[in-house]
Amino acid sequence: MKKDIPVKKNSTYNLYITGMGTKGEGIGKINNFTIFVTGAILGEEVEVNIIKVNKNYAVGKLLNIITPSANRVEPPCDIYTKCGGCQLQHMSYKEQLNFKRQKVKDALLRLGGIDVEVEEVLGMENPYRYRNKVQLPIGKEKGKVNIGFYAPRSHNIIDLKSCFIQDEKADKIIKILKEWIEKFNVSIYDEKEHKGNLRHIMVRTAFRTGQIMIVLVTKDKKLPHKEELINKLTEDLEGVVSIIQNMNSQKTNVVLGKESIVLWGKDKIIDYIGNFKFAITPLSFFQVNPIQTEVLYNKALEYADLKGDEVVFDAYCGTGTISLFLSQKAKKVYGVEIVNEAIESAKLNARENNVDNVDFIVGESEQIIPELIEKGIKADVVVVDPPRKGCEKSLLEAMAKMAPEKIVYVSCDPATLARDLGVLEELGYKTMKVQPVDMFSNTYHVETIILMTYYGDKKK
């Protein structure tokens, strides 16, 4: 029997928002039929125009807020509704944290069958200006230079004068770059035609040391009038220690190419997380919110509860940041990462910080763990910080065979976290603590750190 759909495209309806979607959309129902509304908040009555209808849900465009929520605030950014960078600026920060906590709780219960207390989200004192890295496409439309983020679900560049989640000095750098492009009529890359030269700008700021790296991404090696830009950037701004040109001649959405040349200054900047020093190059992975990264890693250390004689296994060690934190309290840490360049950076970071109780290994953790077991090496604690897609099931099974007393799972996606925890619970682990951390304020993203303890059969 065909399901009757109670709404029609291009029609207008009043709607009560009774829930929130995973990307911060308001959710309401008409005759039990679900409607998603970007920009609406739980508890509001809104007027919407239906712009998309599927058999199980519809999407409504917010036309009018009939009854606003007490948690609604005026977004500070004047391009907030056009830009794809933030999704929650219209919510009070307290409500953003409530939303993120509920998002984690819902995912664990609905997708993992795990009913557990979720702690209040560890938020920021100031939820703005927290990003230490920004990379922006550069384009031209009707003769006007645009530097900014892409509009949602498009490659249309929304020009920005100021971004409230990136470091303020990046705003000044972008302004100088735009003036230079206009003054010298600098060739700008057209991604449709694969013509032109200047593609992206990336700015990396070391919050602790104040050092700034500016990366100009071009299609060609030639960069006319670069001396004028270098002079302006270095004269007008404090902290600039590195200006780099990165060449990317490929027809691709990948921002950085493989070849870089130093135009001025150094080839890296230095920053700290806790007491550890890290060298950052254009291609280095480094957490974009160093303030909350320290909060997150200290929580990982707390959950691991190391006494000094434990062996720890870090299954997605990247450039070694969590491994180094764990090394402070562990007897030995083994860090594994499939990307060779990341392992080389991890080894360098260990040397630079005089850490000698960490071994970094290139490979897949699901293959390395059995090799370590064969050598008689067993972990007391396993830490995983996987990409958004979560862990391979074979890794979870290998971890369970190693049977560590504790697993500390750091996740950037509640859905894949819930799936993986469900698997681990079947393999003999119990979820004990769930702590969300707000790493990406004003966006729908949330980081979560989990403590699991072993209760299964040690002989398996």
UniProtKB/Swiss-Prot annotation:
Disulfide bridges in this chain: none
Residues given in the record as S-adenosyl-L-methionine binding sites: Q287, Y316, E337, D385
Positions of [4Fe-4S] cluster binding: C77, C83, C86, C163
Highest taxon in the source lineage: Bacteria
Sorted UniProt keywords: 4Fe-4S, Iron, Iron-sulfur, Metal-binding, Methyltransferase, S-adenosyl-L-methionine, Transferase
Domain TRAM: 6-64
Molecular function GO labels: 4 iron, 4 sulfur cluster binding; metal ion binding; rRNA (uridine-C5-)-methyltransferase activity
E.C. designation(s): 2.1.1.-
Family matches, as Pfam families: TRAM, tRNA_U5-meth_tr
Database matches in NCBIfam families: rumA
Family per record: Belongs to the class I-like SAM-binding methyltransferase superfamily. RNA M5U methyltransferase family.
Protein name: Uncharacterized RNA methyltransferase CTC_02481
Organism, scientific name: Clostridium tetani (strain Massachusetts / E88)
